[in-house]
């Protein structure tokens, strides 16, 4: 390894000397001190960045002229000179070839002045050197010396397909798709870019690009002051970006100080405290973010006052307590606890007050939400004498529930007709059953007031059913099609008592032509039927005064009604009625409501003088 080191140094100096004898090498190494560390990339791509020689090269870029890095190199050269000729004898055979085309990139063509610009690539956090050739800007990074291969091959005039194929075959490449146009493309290592430039013979066009210490070209005497300012600004900005990125990682105070001491140890030693001092003060206005940086500085700095002030603004005592806890905890752990503890602490008093208020608002808002529905149906409500119930609903739960017992009887009675016709339509609304209705309705209203408010919306349909429900008790169960359901059981079987069906009987089927045909059928099949009913087939249009006679007569033909209905069906639905005995009607009622609806007009046929209304009352029972 001792021999390997001198040989590398020898090659570096030999390349810099441009073929000069070895003894003048020591002379040229002084003025060329910034070159020696830069040479290894050309000769041995893998080693130069791993060995000690290139590290001064990097420091040389950071500090400018690399005076400290150049110092140790000449000091090593005189001590190693006796060793240099030995490896040089064997190595000089191979070196001139590499060295020959390396000079093309290192030395300017005759009459050409270097034109290099530098820009700070904020996305990558690196300084880029740019060289323009044939109207194309080719950039080279300062940190890893990669070159934009896409722009490089564009300078060569290569087609897009060939260029992309070459760049895709590169093992080491960095694709950039976001950023300035001259920085987009595929970035390749310095050595590969130099090979491509030599093959395409564009190295001279890109002269300053491949100079190892390209940063030194920026320090031209006519341009030195400004370029030094630009480089210093770039370094400061790079450090600021590094410090702004690292704090969220966990322990910024531990990370920044070594970082600064490594990058620029001398003057930057005081920066860590300053850099950490600024972000918390600047960002203290927003509550969640300051703990990320200020938590590490919190015990040492006065920024805790800011946090205490914020905590007090939200909730005085709890905010200060949270900060005290943060000061005692570790810096990394105090960061999340600050926003986690103070906001809940500040929210607790409001939460406790609002939770109770919110519950009361919900209690009072429930009737208010119920009230819109009654309000929309207010006309119907007043028609049926339920205006008082809505006043009680608007009052609030405590007032409506206790007072709803006595007057709500009306409301609940109507509600049973309105929203619960399927439940109570089967039953007669006599005194005892009405009392039961009121009791059950009271249970519903106390349990769910929201449903109670919706009930009146259906009340406009109830009275017709309710007024006729008393007559439904006079109809035989077999006649209604639901013999298995007694009047009391209808409360638990709403499906068999669907509400919409009676409406169709009222409008469509109460006085339909089928009703007219029923007497004809009775006259044709059994002549005694009209006599039993107390009139002929034309009794369908008999005045209501005859209702007293047919009312008692309706009980006799009731069991025979389904057979008669089959005739009313005109034979089209006769098969259904023949296949459906009276005992099967309840089961069939679940599946064939329409057929039952059409079969229900049979009671009018028995009483046809004017008993269409009782059939309506009977229909809810069979439902």
From Swiss-Prot:
One GO CC term on file: nucleus
Annotated segments matching region Disordered: 13-111, 232-270, 332-623
SMART domains, per database record: KilA-N
Major localisation: nucleus
GO function terms (MF aspect): DNA-binding transcription factor activity; sequence-specific DNA binding
Gene3D superfamilies attached to this UniProt entry: Transcription regulator HTH, APSES-type DNA-binding domain
Keyword Transcription regulation found: yes
Record-annotated HTH APSES-type domain positions: 115-221
Annotated Polar residues bias: 13-31, 335-374
Subcellular compartments: Nucleus
SUPFAM superfamilies given in the database record: DNA-binding domain of Mlu1-box binding protein MBP1 (SSF54616)
Pfam families, sorted: KilA-N
Record bears the keyword Oxidoreductase: no
InterPro entries recorded: EFG1/Phd1/StuA (IPR029790), HTH_APSES_sf (IPR036887), KilA/APSES_HTH (IPR018004), Tscrpt_reg_HTH_APSES-type (IPR003163)
Entry keywords, A to Z: Conidiation, DNA-binding, Nucleus, Sporulation, Transcription, Transcription regulation
Extent of Low complexity compositional bias: 396-408, 542-553
GO biological process annotation, one example: conidium formation
Segments for region (Nuclear localization domain): 569-594
DNA-binding region coordinates: 149-170
Disruption phenotype: Blocks the conidiation through severely down-regulating the expression of brlA and abaA. Drastically reduces cephalosporin production by decreasing expression of pcbAB, pbcC, cefD1, cefD2, cefEF and cefG. Reduces also the expression of the mannoprotein encoding genes Acmp2 and Acmp3 and impairs cell wall integrity.
Family in the record: Belongs to the EFG1/PHD1/stuA family.
Function: Transcription factor that regulates asexual reproduction. Binds the StuA-response elements (StRE) with the consensus sequence 5'-(A/T)CGCG(T/A)N(A/C)-3' at the promoters of target genes. Controls conidiation by positively regulating the expression of brlA and abaA. Positively regulates the cephalosporin biosynthesis gene cluster. Also involved hyphal fragmentation and cell wall integrity.
Name recorded for this polypeptide: Cell pattern formation-associated protein stuA
Organism, as annotated: Hapsidospora chrysogenum (strain ATCC 11550 / CBS 779.69 / DSM 880 / IAM 14645 / JCM 23072 / IMI 49137)
Gene symbol of the encoding locus: stuA
């Amino acid at each position: 390894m001792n021999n390997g080191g001198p040989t590398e140094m020898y090659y570096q100096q030999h390349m810099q000397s441009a073929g000069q004898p070895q003894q003048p090498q020591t002379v040229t190494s002084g003025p060329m001190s910034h070159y020696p560390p830069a040479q290894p990339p050309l000769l041995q791509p893998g080693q130069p960045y791993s060995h000690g020689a290139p590290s001064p090269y990097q420091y040389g870029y950071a500090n400018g002229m690399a005076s400290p890095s150049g110092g140790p190199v000449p000091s090593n050269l005189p001590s190693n000179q006796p060793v240099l000729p030995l490896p040089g004898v064997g190595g000089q055979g191979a070196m001139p070839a590499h060295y020959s085309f390396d000079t093309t990139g290192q030395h300017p063509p005759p009459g050409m002045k270097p034109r290099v610009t530098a820009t700070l690539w904020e996305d990558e956090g690196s300084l880029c050197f740019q060289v323009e050739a044939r109207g194309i800007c080719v950039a080279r990074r300062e940190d890893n010396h990669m070159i934009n291969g896409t722009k490089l091959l564009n300078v060569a005039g290569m087609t897009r397909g060939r260029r992309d194929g070459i760049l895709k075959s590169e093992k080491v490449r960095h694709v950039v798709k976001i950023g300035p146009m001259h920085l987009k493309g595929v970035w390749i290592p310095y050595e590969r870019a130099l090979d491509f430039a030599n093959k395409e013979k564009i190295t001279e066009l890109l002269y300053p690009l491949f100079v190892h210490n390209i940063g030194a070209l920026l320090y031209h005497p006519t341009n030195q002051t400004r370029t030094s300012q630009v480089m210093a600004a770039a370094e400061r900005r790079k450090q600021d970006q590094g410090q702004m990125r690292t704090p969220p990682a966990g322990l910024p105070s531990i990370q920044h100080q070594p970082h600064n001491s490594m990058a620029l140890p001398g003057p930057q030693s005081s920066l860590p405290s300053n850099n950490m001092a600024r972000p918390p003060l600047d960002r203290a206005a927003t509550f969640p973010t300051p703990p990320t940086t200020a938590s590490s500085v919190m015990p040492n700095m006065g920024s805790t006052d800011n946090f205490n002030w914020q905590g007090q603004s939200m909730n005085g005592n709890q905010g200060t307590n949270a900060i005290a806890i943060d000061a005692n905890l570790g810096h990394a752990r105090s960061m999340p606890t600050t926003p986690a503890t103070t906001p809940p602490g500040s929210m607790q008093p409001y939460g406790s007050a609002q939770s109770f208020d919110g519950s009361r608002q919900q209690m009072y808002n429930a009737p208010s939400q119920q009230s819109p529905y009654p309000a929309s149906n207010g006309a119907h409500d007043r028609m049926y004498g339920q205006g008082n119930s809505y006043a009680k609903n608007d009052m609030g739960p405590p007032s409506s529930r206790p007072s709803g017992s006595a007057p709500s009887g009306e409301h609940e009675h109507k509600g049973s007709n309105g929203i619960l016709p399927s439940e109570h339509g089967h039953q007669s609304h006599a005194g005892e059953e009405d009392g039961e209705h009121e009791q059950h309705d009271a249970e519903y209203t106390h349990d769910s007031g929201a449903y109670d408010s919706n009930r009146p919306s259906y009340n406009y349909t109830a009275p017709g059913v309710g007024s006729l429900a008393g007559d439904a008790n006079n109809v035989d169960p077999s006649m209604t099609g639901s013999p298995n359901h007694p009047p009391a059981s209808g409360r638990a079987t709403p499906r068999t008592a669907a509400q919409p069906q009676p409406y169709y009987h009222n409008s469509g089927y109460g006085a339909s032509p089928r009703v007219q045909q029923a007497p004809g059928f009775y006259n044709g099949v059994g002549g005694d039927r009209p006599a039993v009913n107390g009139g002929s087939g034309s009794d369908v249009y008999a005045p209501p005064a005859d209702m007293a006679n047919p009312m008692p007569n309706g009980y006799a033909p009731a069991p025979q009604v389904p057979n008669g209905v089959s005739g009313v069906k005109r034979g089209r639905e006769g098969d259904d009625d023949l296949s459906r005995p009276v005992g099967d009607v309840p089961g069939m009622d679940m599946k064939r409501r329409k057929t039952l609806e059409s079969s229900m007009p049979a009671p009018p046929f028995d009483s046809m003088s004017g008993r269409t209304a009782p059939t309506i009352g009977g229909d809810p029972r069979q439902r």
